[in-house]
């Protein structure tokens, strides 16, 4: 094992700077002459994605086979941190077997809005639940000697303009909603690394944000690991290093090294800043490499498939079961309809896409079950194209069955990294099919596949609804067992399902092309809004049915937590997820009507009862006092609410809590809309009162951070031409129903990323020449690009020669 302090004394400043950026798409820079190995990083929120051949960060090229577990959005419905730890351990084992040192996950972004195209990679709208689950994944991954890298830190809630948007959020909302999940993950999971997000937060890029990285992450939480940029996410490398960012990825080449050297020479940063970052990076490199050297080069694929199936079982959510249609009895004549039954949708698209070791198919599992499968019909084109013949054949089959199992859902391109959803609806051809089938056979079980919320105005057309989410490669077996009663669904929703998208508090301001993203709703995301505003929803946070019933009784409560008795009052074994919410009536602060502060899973046989305890931690009663700039507690009476969902509260006890608050955070501000939870249309004036300063105006500037999708603002024919070509290609891909993820990434990419993602082929000086061209200085810009290109080639060659010691 290398001694980092001694090693730092041996390295030249240039060598030190070179170590702080990647060498290839997923590899760090090694220096064998100093005993510093090169290590692999790999995507892997729900399955490893190591690309043995040509690598990319969007999941476009195939990867080495790995187990595809249910996505984070699915596993979150299990409310089982221990299960997350098991999945994490399997991910870590597969990473070690494939010689991957850092697993880039789990994803901890808060689900501010259900249209986020990447919601399937994230756990919940609630930071407490998300943090607890993420901590489990992290502990599991790192139990195998591999480093976890939770992401994306922070306030990154949309894919639109994700590399160049500025999240404008007040400090209390930042702390209580968008950072608490990361805080729990860091303090309880102890990750060796963390990934910064692409976006700016209140005017400063997250990767160089001193408030986020130094004051909060490293200062308050005690994080001492490596902060890794998202791929191409570095804006000012030197400022990032100074303010706590460790490793710039993927492969910016020698220009990045020269940027740091120049910053040291100018006094912008010091060599001590660079040493501090290497003291975070090098132990990670040495420790993980040593663990990988001792790890076996294979894993038990069958055992991991079995774990993936159990995870899918625990993640299923029964949303409707009219007349106890489910479970289906042996011998029931069933018609299986829907393309997803034969061609499963089990994961999302983008950088998390896994090349699965195997994939189970629901139709096959149903045929192998005790049901009498009388036939299968595709029913609809999964990409939305109307097809009357498919619908007619499905209806003819449905007339012959006792029960119809209809598999519906979102297609592969509806949810993906790189683009946000345009609506919450299922394809119209699927809804038409459901209505047509219901007309000939009302006994319909809908099995729904999606990574996030969908609107369900069609709910009356089915008797049962089983939410399969994106259940991973073994999800089909879990669904079949749930339909037949071998598995009793126990999952509960980790996000609210609204009646309509218009009800979502951020609906009016989500995924616009504006530079600034204004978090006007403040604390009120998800159930925090719906319960406070008393707005009806389709399915509330924490909701999920079972084939049995549970009774809650004999509650006792104090500041430490609650205890109660849970009894299985039904006829089959089952698992209940008991939820603890905290509420404060007549608060002097504005706050959500109730907030999740604890939960517990309990598995009971028929008639069995068990006494359970749910403890409260230091986050149970705290709020961020923006005036005192610290966590405080408002004293007084609180309600501890125990229930089966945020709306189904079974027991309540009141306790008195001693307060610490000495100054009212909002005594000089009129914030009536926030006290009422009336945040659908927050005015500029009210949002500025919440922020405590004027709303920043995001102006389009022709500089390094101009995105390719904004080149129509350029004063250059070349810029307009590039913009026009990209726009035409992108629009064409949308019309085909298959948005091109690569073009989408380029469209939202700032010019500076050209210098961060081309392995040194393009320097920042060349980017500055391009900017001059776009500003209208056509000749000077072209000359600058040519000059900087020649200079870059020469300097890169000289630097590589020095670094190789030649």
Where are these regions (language model features)?
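Charged, amphipathic alpha-helical linkers/stalks
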Residues: 646, 653-723
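A generic signature of intrinsically disordered, low-complexity regions enriched in glycine/proline
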Residues: 47, 368, 507, 572, ...
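Long, low-hydrophobicity ectodomains and other hydrophilic envelope-associated domains
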Residues: 689-806
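Glycoside hydrolase catalytic-domain context in secreted enzymes
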Residues: 1-619, 623, 637-641, 646, ...
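Terminal connector regions
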Residues: 618-665
């Amino acid at each position: 094992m290398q001694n980092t302090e001694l090693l730092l004394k041996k390295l030249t400043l240039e060598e030190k700077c070179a170590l702080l950026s990647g060498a290839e798409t997923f590899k760090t820079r090694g220096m064998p002459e100093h005993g510093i190995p090169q290590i692999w990083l790999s995507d892997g929120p729900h399955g490893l994605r190591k690309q043995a051949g040509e690598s990319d960060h969007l999941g476009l090229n195939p990867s080495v086979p790995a187990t595809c577990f249910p996505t984070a959005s699915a596993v979150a419905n299990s409310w089982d941190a221990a299960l997350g730890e098991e999945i994490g351990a399997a991910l870590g084992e597969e990473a070690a077997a494939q010689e991957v040192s850092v697993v880039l996950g789990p994803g901890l972004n808060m689900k501010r809005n259900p249209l986020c195209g990447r919601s399937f990679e994230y756990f919940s709208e609630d930071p407490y639940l998300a943090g607890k689950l993420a901590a489990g994944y992290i502990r599991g991954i790192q139990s195998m000697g591999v480093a976890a890298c939770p992401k994306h830190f922070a306030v990154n809630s949309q894919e639109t303009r994700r590399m160049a948007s500025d999240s404008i959020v007040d400090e209390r909302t930042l702390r209580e909603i968008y950072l608490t999940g990361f805080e729990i993950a860091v303090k309880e999971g102890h990750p060796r690394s963390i990934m910064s997000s692409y976006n700016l937060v209140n005017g400063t890029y997250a990767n160089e944000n001193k408030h986020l990285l130094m004051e909060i992450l490293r200062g308050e939480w005690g994080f001492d690991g490596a902060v890794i940029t998202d791929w191409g996410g570095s804006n000012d490398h030197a400022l990032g290093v100074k303010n706590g960012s460790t490793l710039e990825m993927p492969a910016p080449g020698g220009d990045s090294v020269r940027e740091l050297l120049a910053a040291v020479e100018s006094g912008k940063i010091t060599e001590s800043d660079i040493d501090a970052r290497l003291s975070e990076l090098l132990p990670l490199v040495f420790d993980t490499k040593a663990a990988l050297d001792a790890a076996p080069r294979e894993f038990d694929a069958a055992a991991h498939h079995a774990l993936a199936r159990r995870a899918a079982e625990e993640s299923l959510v029964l949303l409707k079961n009219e007349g106890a249609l489910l479970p289906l009895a042996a011998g029931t004549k069933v018609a299986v309809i829907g393309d997803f039954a034969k061609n499963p949708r089990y994961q999302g698209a983008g950088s998390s896409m896994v090349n699965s070791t195997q994939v189970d198919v629901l139709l096959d599992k149903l045929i192998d079950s005790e049901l009498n499968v009388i036939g299968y019909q595709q029913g609809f084109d999964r990409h939305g194209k109307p097809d009357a013949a498919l619908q007619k054949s499905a209806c003819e089959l449905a007339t012959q069955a006792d029960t119809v199992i209809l598999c519906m859902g979102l297609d592969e391109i509806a949810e993906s990294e790189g683009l946000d959803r345009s609506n919450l609806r299922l394809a119209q051809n699927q809804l038409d099919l459901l209505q047509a089938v219901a007309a000939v056979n009302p006994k319909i079980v809908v099995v729904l596949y999606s990574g996030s919320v969908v609107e369900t105005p069609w709910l009356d057309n089915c008797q049962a609804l089983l939410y399969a989410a994106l259940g991973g490669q073994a999800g089909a077996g879990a669904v079949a067992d749930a339909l037949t009663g071998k598995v009793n669904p126990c999952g509960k929703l980790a996000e609210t399902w609204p009646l309509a998208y218009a009800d979502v508090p951020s609906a009016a301001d989500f995924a616009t092309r504006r530079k600034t993203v204004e978090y006007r709703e403040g604390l009120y995301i998800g159930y925090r809004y719906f319960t406070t505003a008393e707005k009806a929803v389709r399915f509330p946070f924490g909701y999920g049915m079972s084939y049995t019933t549970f009774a809650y009784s004999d509650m006792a409560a104090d500041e430490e937590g609650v205890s109660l008795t849970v009894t299985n009052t039904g006829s089959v074994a089952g698992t209940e997820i008991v939820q603890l919410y905290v509420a404060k009536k007549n608060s002097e602060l504005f706050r959500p009507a109730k907030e999740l502060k604890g939960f517990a899973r309990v598995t009971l046989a028929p008639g069995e009862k068990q006494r359970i305890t749910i403890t409260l931690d230091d986050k149970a009663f705290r709020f961020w006092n923006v005036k005192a700039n610290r966590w405080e507690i408002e004293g007084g009476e609180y309600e501890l609410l125990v229930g089966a969902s945020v709306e189904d509260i079974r027991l309540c006890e009141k306790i008195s809590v001693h307060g610490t608050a000495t100054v009212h955070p909002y005594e000089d501000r009129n914030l009536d809309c926030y006290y009422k939870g009336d945040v659908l249309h927050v005015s500029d004036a009210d949002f500025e009162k919440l922020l405590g300063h004027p709303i920043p105006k995001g102006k389009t500037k022709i500089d390094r951070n101009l995105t390719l999708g904004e080149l129509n603002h350029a004063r250059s024919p070349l810029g307009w031409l590039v913009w026009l070509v990209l726009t035409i290609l992108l629009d064409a891909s949308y019309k085909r129903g298959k948005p091109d993820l690569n073009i989408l990434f380029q469209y939202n990419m700032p010019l500076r990323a050209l210098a961060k993602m081309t392995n040194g082929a393009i320097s920042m000086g060349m980017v500055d020449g391009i900017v001059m061209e776009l500003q209208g200085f056509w000749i000077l810009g072209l000359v600058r690009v040519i000059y900087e290109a020649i200079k870059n080639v020469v300097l890169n060659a000289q630097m590589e020669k020095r670094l190789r010691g030649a």
